Amino acid sequence: MNVALQELGAGSNMVEYKRATLRDEDAPETPVEGGASPDAMEVGKGASPFSPGPSPGMTPGTPRSSGLFWRVTCPHLRSISGLCSRTMVGFQKGTRQLLGSRTQLELVLAGASLLLAALLLGCLVALGVQYHRDPSHSTCLTEACIRVAGKILESLDRGVSPCEDFYQFSCGGWIRRNPLPDGRSRWNTFNSLWDQNQAILKHLLENTTFNSSSEAEQKTQRFYLSCLQVERIEELGAQPLRDLIEKIGGWNITGPWDQDNFMEVLKAVAGTYRATPFFTVYISADSKSSNSNVIQVDQSGLFLPSRDYYLNRTANEKVLTAYLDYMEELGMLLGGRPTSTREQMQQVLELEIQLANITVPQDQRRDEEKIYHKMSISELQALAPSMDWLEFLSFLLSPLELSDSEPVVVYGMDYLQQVSELINRTEPSILNNYLIWNLVQKTTSSLDRRFESAQEKLLETLYGTKKSCVPRWQTCISNTDDALGFALGSLFVKATFDRQSKEIAEGMISEIRTAFEEALGQLVWMDEKTRQAAKEKADAIYDMIGFPDFILEPKELDDVYDGYEISEDSFFQNMLNLYNFSAKVMADQLRKPPSRDQWSMTPQTVNAYYLPTKNEIVFPAGILQAPFYARNHPKALNFGGIGVVMGHELTHAFDDQGREYDKEGNLRPWWQNESLAAFRNHTACMEEQYNQYQVNGERLNGRQTLGENIADNGGLKAAYNAYKAWLRKHGEEQQLPAVGLTNHQLFFVGFAQVWCSVRTPESSHEGLVTDPHSPARFRVLGTLSNSRDFLRHFGCPVGSPMNPGQLCEVW
């Protein structure tokens, strides 16, 4: 197996350092497999990719995690701004119905929007005839400018003053025109764009003349079609999972089980099938020696999105009851008896509650210097003696030979010590039930409709999602993206990506980096030695744009998936093969150095990320399209869209976590004490600012969201300064027609409209307790109320809601 792929490990509770523009939970509630899954990987030339992508801001080596409810990375979406012309061709050609059915209200609103847009277009075209007679006129009347002006106008709410509530001013019209689609708990620009990308992929995979010279691309189509074989999946029912449970040694809930096989079951569940009971194990770059990979162990094992759901039992009584009902229903579908199944699942739930009690909250895990502990396997054995770590890790990383002296990095020593004690005092039958429950969670999305229906009931309680109307093909595209994401990316890039976009994006990154470094030179609170080291780090940031080159080389692409077998008539078996293959790929990484050219997101992903152990920023092809970027849009919109995303990722190198890493990607102290103290004073202001914001009466956690808030604020400033530098070099742009905004104002409106969003109250609560990003509304309000440039261009007086008087600035 010719692989150079790095296993990223996952787990919603892992230390979080891979910094993404948005959380993967902004993905849809399309069922994907398993709780916290370590099947996500980085991939580079000659490497083996799967379910890629970073969980929003996770630790070095943290991935997008495939969750039963949470797909960690890309959002599923539907665009308000349309696709660039080249992508639109790929989107429309030969396709049938590309999106799911809409509600009657949505259709009425869509019709009204089209009518208004047509009237606007007619007026603007008429104006265009007149204005084009005067070439000196400062209004842009190209077709692209007219279309984007219409999009902006229909998203605005002119009844609100921009100095009162800039989010409502920018997004009020969009919110009115975008009721939540059926089956979704949230809807935003990212979701919309991902839906469009999915429709492109559907067309490519269902093409009856599909004839690729790449075996990996052929595997991608076979995998996708096996997922679409609903009749075959229904015919098999629960039997594939029943057989698997029997093979492992049985499950007390459904029948006889081997009472003396804790280690064997743990090895099968966590090793062969890559579930994460109790803890997660993954291979990633050593934070203190980033040129080498090392075994890493972290806390894991909770099924619900956050420990809060287990511990605040009064507030979350409905969720816990729905979860227990879900557990019971799945146990019954697999052969459990009514009375005993609920009783035993209650015991499993109580065990998860005990795990939640010892799980360290996200906001207490932001300083990796404090939670990073490197030790040998023998020292790990002494710390957590409830299991044989050498036996377990040797099985997990077979055929590698390990010894007691093998180094391991542990994040959360107290957690592992306490989980070992918990295992020792828990009855063997409960341990077995919990382990098999982790396997059940991971695999049931590959089974028949009854399991999907059970999940939908839990989703409704947890996220406020009504009965799902997500078409099967969308679920299958997501699964294919998880399994063969870079082979799928090869198809996507060849069909849609404009190569010139890569060159233009590289130029924008350079401009934004220059603007950031110029601002760095003006900071009065930073000493010269630290400033010079920070400038060197900014200069050293490595950028990757669009896609990795190897995906367009058939032989190299085939090599990375060599050994992954695809059955044409068993989707369940294809998923099992994926878990097994990913385990082998993970083992292959330990003795190899990390590659700087590895990718952690597939090209079709609508997201971006910064990875501190490589000091790199990555922008997949999926996000390099409208509304973030379009070649024929005003520069104000491009800098306000993809420019702010670029600035955001670059600023992550200097947020409260990224700043701990040097230019080589190593975790070490490189700041002078006085500058570090000043940095903490500035971030304390921002933490307190965001602590004051509320959603439905519930406060934001300014500590949990600090890194993303720093990146949002720094990214906006860098992008705007880069735009001003562009204007100094090229001169003022023509203005858009009819919108009544200067181009400087347009920059800020373009930034805000990227974050237009709607979501259910339940989903909003889930975001507050799990997401390292602030809610969309406060990503706009919090950032702009700290921007002197915004306040000046919109004339917001001190004391107005958008200008409270005190500005919190870090970078």
Swiss-Prot record:
Organism in which the protein naturally occurs: Homo sapiens (Human)
Keywords recorded for this protein, A-Z: Cytoplasmic vesicle, Disulfide bond, Glycoprotein, Golgi apparatus, Hydrolase, Membrane, Metal-binding, Metalloprotease, Methyltransferase, Multifunctional enzyme, Protease, Signal-anchor, Transferase, Transmembrane, Transmembrane helix, Zinc
Main location as per UniProt: Golgi
Intrachain S-S bonds: 140-145, 163-796, 171-756, 227-476, 685-808
Residue numbers spanned by region Disordered: 22-64
Segments crossing the lipid bilayer: 107-127
One GO-annotated biological process of the protein: cell-cell signaling
Glycan attachment sites: 207, 211, 252, 312, 357, 424, 580, 673, 681
Name recorded for this polypeptide: Endothelin-converting enzyme 2
Gene of this entry: ECE2
